[in-house]
């Protein structure tokens, strides 16, 4: 059937892996008869997890759009990965959602996925709802979990449904606002007598929250006058939009308990796209302003995700103005390229349904639009205003990518270009110093998936290794050395003779060269040759072959031959002085030091500080984070070489709640006890090369 923006609900599913998001999608589809049997992740038959890697690993790695039609409305459920290595997908989904539904289980309760889901929605300014799943599991306790939610997230958290229990078994549920009870098939059953006390308690709390949305309602509340059904619905919708009402729903996906009630409440109370948070638009000069969806405007779409399969590229979009029709020719505002739409679809997991029109507020898929990537805005030719693109957290987990088979490096690079179209949250590039291809992601799971996709999609195998650390070398003593190059082989010979003083300096990492010769002992035209010879050498130190920094070289004496001296002869003489002089000048290794900022819960402070001490870190300060109550920001300086596995280790220490940034600040001397191993490894690598 045809829909308008008023009939659309775009809901972002959040929560940790295993908390029932994909199962809930299956239950919604089954309840609305969109599928004939419930898929299971273990069998690889869920609609939302259709990628080969998702089936193999049995967890989501990309978001998927599951449209559910209920009560003359279309609910686009955007199912997101539960593991936060794939948080880039969540960032993208939140840009087109109008509300979020956070899943957690009645057995496990609040977890890191619950907390992060709340923070994502808070940061995005989107309404939040909770769904407590798996009421049928042993030791499930809805009311304990509800109390935990209210304790953590405040008085706005109110159960819109709660279970009817026989012993510990959920046999039905109560809809708070309808004041009715339902079974797993959504059929009304008698309301238990003991439910009335809970209804009265929860309705009193809901009325108080609703009263705060409007002065007239507040006045009625204080006068103890009941709200009409229309006033209550309007107040609930306003409260959800303003985040002063956070509904809690419950159910069991595989029995269907609660699914119909959840769908009905989403249709009734969740904001439609016209009521959702405005987007941000950017003009040609970079000025930002608010953008509100306009069903009557000229056609515009925002591309929020990209997936590629054997048939080509699929660009997932939300219509933000007018309607998108398959006869249109649109322009990519970023590139100016024109694209004829042609094939346009409604997504449902891996299956797309062809359509000729997608209305404002709805979600669709374009296929084979060459110039389009995630974050692009499409509009009629001549459109210059675009929607602000995504911003991802800086990826901190870095590894080096090596070809398993020599000669396939170009195929790997081309494959990463394609994978980048699907996942904008990772970065890659060649390190000019180490000559390694460096890939950076959120964590090891993300990079593992990318390597697997290189093999499965682009038929090239790559392995990940720890990235080399950019050490440096310097000297600690002043030395004076004589470098002499003399060679006679018939005809013109070669002669260069220099006396050079090497000493440490602190002004610049780059070598400082000085000329103190007098009397023409080294002709002026050969002094640049001496400097060039030294600069050719400082790229490779005498300890482990790392570049030499903070070095001053002073040419203070020398001699020449009127016939045999040449540019090359003096370059060679300078090189001899370097190779013979630096080993006697107290050479030492320097390591990069990073400025570390770690955001962690108070409860993990001891573990994190102890771990930093093991990494030779120096804690510079600790302060409460004003934006995250119960969290601390730890500032430290730490050797970069000690941080290779920090993403994984911090995740383990903080159960996934911690995050960090690390930025290079300077070089410092490596402790002598650590230098031998670094030198040994560098020499071994050179021999193997």
Predicted regions and their residues:
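Structural and coupling elements of P-loop NTPases
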Residues: 1-689
């Amino acid at each position: 059937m045809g829909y308008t923006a008023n009939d659309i609900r775009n809901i972002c599913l959040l929560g940790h892996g295993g908390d029932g998001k994909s199962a809930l999608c299956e239950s919604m589809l089954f309840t609305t008869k969109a599928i004939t049997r419930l898929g299971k992740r273990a069998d690889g038959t869920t609609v939302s997890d259709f990628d080969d890697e998702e089936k193999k690993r049995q967890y989501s790695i990309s978001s998927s759009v599951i449209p559910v039609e209920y009560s003359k409305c279309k609910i686009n459920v955007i199912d997101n990965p539960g593991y936060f290595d794939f948080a880039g997908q969540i960032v993208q989904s939140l840009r087109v959602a109008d509300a979020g539904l956070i899943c957690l289980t009645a057995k496990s309760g609040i977890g890191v996925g619950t907390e992060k889901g709340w923070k994502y929605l808070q940061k995005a300014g989107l309404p939040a709802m909770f769904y407590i799943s798996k009421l049928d599991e042993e030791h499930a306790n809805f009311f304990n979990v509800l109390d935990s939610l209210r304790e953590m997230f405040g008085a706005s958290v109110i159960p819109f449904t709660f279970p009817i229990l026989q012993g510990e078994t959920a046999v039905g549920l109560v809809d708070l606002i309808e004041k009715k009870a339902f079974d797993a098939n959504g059929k009304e059953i008698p309301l238990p007598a003991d439910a009335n006390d809970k209804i009265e308690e929860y309705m009193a709390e809901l009325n108080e929250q609703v009263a705060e949305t409007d002065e007239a309602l507040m006045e009625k509340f204080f006068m103890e006058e009941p709200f009409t059904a229309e006033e209550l619905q309007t107040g609930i919708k306003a409260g959800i939009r303003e985040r002063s009402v956070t509904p809690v729903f419950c159910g069991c996906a595989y029995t269907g308990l609660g699914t119909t009630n959840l769908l009905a409440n989403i249709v009734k109370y969740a904001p439609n796209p016209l009521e959702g948070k405005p987007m941000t638009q950017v003009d040609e000069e970079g000025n930002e302003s608010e953008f509100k969806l306009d069903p009557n405007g000229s056609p515009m779409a925002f591309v929020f995700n990209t997936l590629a399969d054997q048939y080509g590229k699929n660009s997932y979009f939300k219509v933000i103005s007018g309607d998108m029709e398959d006869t249109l020719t649109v322009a990519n505002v970023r590139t100016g390229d024109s694209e004829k739409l042609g094939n346009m679809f409604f997504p449902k997991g891996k299956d797309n349904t062809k359509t000729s029109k997608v209305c404002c507020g709805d979600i669709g898929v374009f296929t084979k639009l060459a110039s389009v990537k995630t974050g692009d805005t499409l509009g009629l030719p001549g459109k210059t205003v675009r929607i602000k693109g995504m911003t991802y957290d800086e990826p901190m987990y870095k590894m080096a990518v090596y070809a398993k088979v020599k000669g396939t490096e170009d195929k790997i690079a081309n494959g990463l270009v394609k994978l980048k179209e699907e996942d904008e949250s990772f970065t890659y590039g060649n390190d000019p110093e180490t000559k390694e291809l460096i890939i950076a992601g959120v964590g090891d799971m993300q990079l593992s998936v990318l390597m697997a996709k290189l093999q499965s999609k682009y038929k090239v195998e790559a392995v990940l290794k720890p990235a080399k650390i950019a050490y440096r070398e310097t000297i600690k003593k002043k030395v004076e050395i004589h470098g002499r190059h003399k060679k006679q082989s018939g005809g013109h010979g070669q002669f260069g003779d220099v006396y050079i003083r090497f000493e440490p300096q602190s002004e610049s990492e780059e070598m400082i060269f000085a000329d103190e010769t007098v009397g023409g002992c080294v002709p002026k035209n050969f002094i640049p040759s001496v400097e060039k010879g030294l600069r050719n050498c400082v790229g490779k130190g005498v300890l482990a072959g790392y570049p030499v920094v903070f070095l001053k070289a002073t040419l203070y004496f020398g001699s020449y031959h009127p016939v045999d001296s040449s540019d090359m002869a003096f370059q060679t003489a300078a090189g001899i002085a370097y190779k013979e002089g630096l080993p006697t000048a107290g050479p030492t290794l320097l390591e990069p030091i990073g400025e570390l900022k770690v955001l962690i819960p108070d409860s993990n402070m001891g573990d994190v500080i102890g771990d930093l001490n093991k990494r030779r870190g120096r804690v510079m300060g600790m302060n409460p984070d004003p934006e995250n109550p119960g969290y601390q920001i730890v500032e430290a300086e730490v050797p970069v070489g000690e941080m290779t596995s920090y993403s994984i280790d911090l995740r383990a220490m903080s159960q996934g709640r911690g995050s960090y940034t690390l930025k290079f600040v300077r070089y410092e001397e490596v402790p002598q006890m650590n230098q031998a191993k670094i030198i040994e490894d560098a020499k071994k690598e050179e021999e193997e090369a």
